[in-house]
A protein has these predicted regions:
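Short hydrophobic/aromatic beta-strand micro-patches
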Residues: 59, 124-126
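Short amphipathic alpha-helices within nucleic acid-binding modules
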Residues: 130-137
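Amphipathic alpha-helical segments
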Residues: 62-80
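Flexible internal linker/loop segments at domain or repeat junctions
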Residues: 103-110
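Eukaryotic phosphotyrosine signaling hubs
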Residues: 54, 120-121
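Vicinal oxygen chelate
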Residues: 1-52, 58, 80-84, 90-95, ...
């Protein structure tokens, strides 16, 4: 951690650190006189698909160093674990210290190539009704330039979701905030990848 944090170009106090997997993590304090506070809400149209960025998903190779960094140093709290196979852990969700947003660790045992990293690392946007959100996207003029299908699926976490990819291949996940049956999915107890 730096001894002193500087002010960024838009007036917020910030600094960067690198996590154990090489991801740059920017720590930001929104200042009262910053562009962020001054312009809050001005560029958000009523036609937007989402009003809340729920989480960011990042690839993690070894769970213990990531837990030490995000939990022990930054104060994130684990609240759910999931497994795609039922044999080895796939995800660990870590809530920020002072809110409901979270970081999703996506665990791997074999390092992914650059193309896989781009489709795995992602931003998740909450939408209250995934069917309505997808219908809105399908009706937009820009849809004719987006060649991939937009499919609604139910994730291991029991929530309906759809994935889109920006022109660089980065995944954008749209997800409903609640499970399909209104009950939380029990966390997985299987071991992390080796």
């Amino acid at each position: 951690m730096p001894e002193k944090a500087g002010k960024g170009k838009i007036g917020n106090t910030n600094f960067n650190v690198t996590d154990p997997d090489g991801h740059t993590v920017e720590i930001v304090q929104y200042e009262p006189d910053s562009w962020t506070r001054r312009e809050k809400g001005k560029y958000i149209p009523a036609t937007r698909i989402s009003t809340h960025m729920a989480h960011v998903g990042v690839m993690v190779g070894v769970l213990d160093p990531a837990m030490k960094f995000y939990h022990d140093i930054l104060g994130f709290q684990e609240f759910w674990r999931g497994s795609a196979s039922g044999k080895v852990l796939s995800w660990v969700n870590m809530r920020v210290p002072d809110g409901d947003d979270y970081l999703e660790f996506m665990l791997y045992s074999t390092p992914p190539d650059a193309a896989q990293m781009g489709t795995k690392n992602h931003v998740c946007l909450f939408t209250p009704n995934i069917e309505k959100a997808v219908a809105t996207l399908e009706a937009r003029p820009a849809r004719k330039n987006y060649r991939r299908p937009i499919e609604i699926k139910i994730g291991v976490n029991g929530k309906r979701q759809a994935n889109l990819f920006d022109p660089d291949g980065t995944r954008i996940e749209l997800m409903e905030p609640n499970t399909t049956d209104g009950k939380p999915v029990a966390p997985s107890t299987v071991p992390a990848p080796k």
